[in-house]
Regions:
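Conserved alpha-helical scaffold flanking the Walker A/P-loop in AAA+ ATPase domains
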Residues: 1-3, 50-51
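Short secondary-structure boundary segments
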Residues: 15, 65-66, 135
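Conserved strand-helix element at the start of the C-terminal RecA-like helicase core
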Residues: 2, 6-26, 31, 35-38
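Arginine-glycine-biased low-complexity disordered regions
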Residues: 104-191
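Short Asp/Glu-rich motifs
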Residues: 17, 47-48, 143
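Conserved RecA-like helicase motor core of SF1/SF2 enzymes
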Residues: 26-129
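Positions that flank functional sites
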Residues: 18, 43, 69, 138-139
């Protein structure tokens, strides 16, 4: 839900173990996102391939452990998501510092449960970090945010049509109407 609500153009997602990196990567891929993992098991050639995909904008989400992510330089990175918070302040600062580099703005999000929250608050106090606490977006929040985003995108495309595109669109209006008439066909549109 966070990824759907935030809609980051790119994100580095941190996990504490390789097993969790594998899990998060597979879940993202099954949801249709461009995601790959960055672990110490990758060969140097594979690492270079993954980084090149990120830099060219062909890979949206890179899921990594702290150890593997040392030295990665991704200046265009918009988001860091800490799927699991680190135990140490230095690791938190290293992770969060991967976004908003070279004067650019960035967003760092840390997911915590009630127990992890107290540890994160200790890190924030020790390092004078101002945290902004927010609940996870609800399904209704995500639906509202995504629908606003899609409507704005479609309206912009509608305003930018030329004569040929208007003519072509007219041919598909009956199909669009028929797809919105039944639940099964509406599901096709939601895909």
């Amino acid at each position: 839900r966070i990824i759907e609500a935030e809609n980051p153009p790119s994100a580095l997602i941190f996990c504490n173990t390789k097993a969790r990196v594998d899990y998060v990567t597979v879940v993202l891929q099954r949801f249709g996102y461009d995601a790959d993992e960055w672990t110490s098991d990758l060969s140097q050639a594979a690492r270079e391939q993954v980084l090149e995909r990120v830099r060219r904008g062909k890979l949206r989400f890179l899921v990594a452990t702290d150890v593997a992510a040392r030295g990665i330089d991704l200046p265009e990175l918009s988001h860091v998501i800490q799927y699991e918070p680190p135990d140490e302040a230095e690791a938190y600062i290293h992770r969060a510092g991967r976004t908003g580099r070279a004067g650019a703005s960035g967003t760092a999000i840390t997911l915590v449960n009630a127990v992890e929250r107290s540890g994160l608050l200790r890190i924030a106090k020790r390092c004078s970090i101002a945290l902004q606490e927010q609940p996870l977006p609800s399904d209704e929040d995500v639906e509202r945010i995504v629908s606003q985003r899609i409507i704005a995108l479609l309206e912009a495309r509608l305003r930018g049509r030329d004569r040929l595109q208007i003519e072509r669109m007219q041919r598909f209006l009956p199909l669009a109407r028929s797809l919105s008439e039944s639940a099964d066909e509406t599901s096709l549109l939601a895909m």
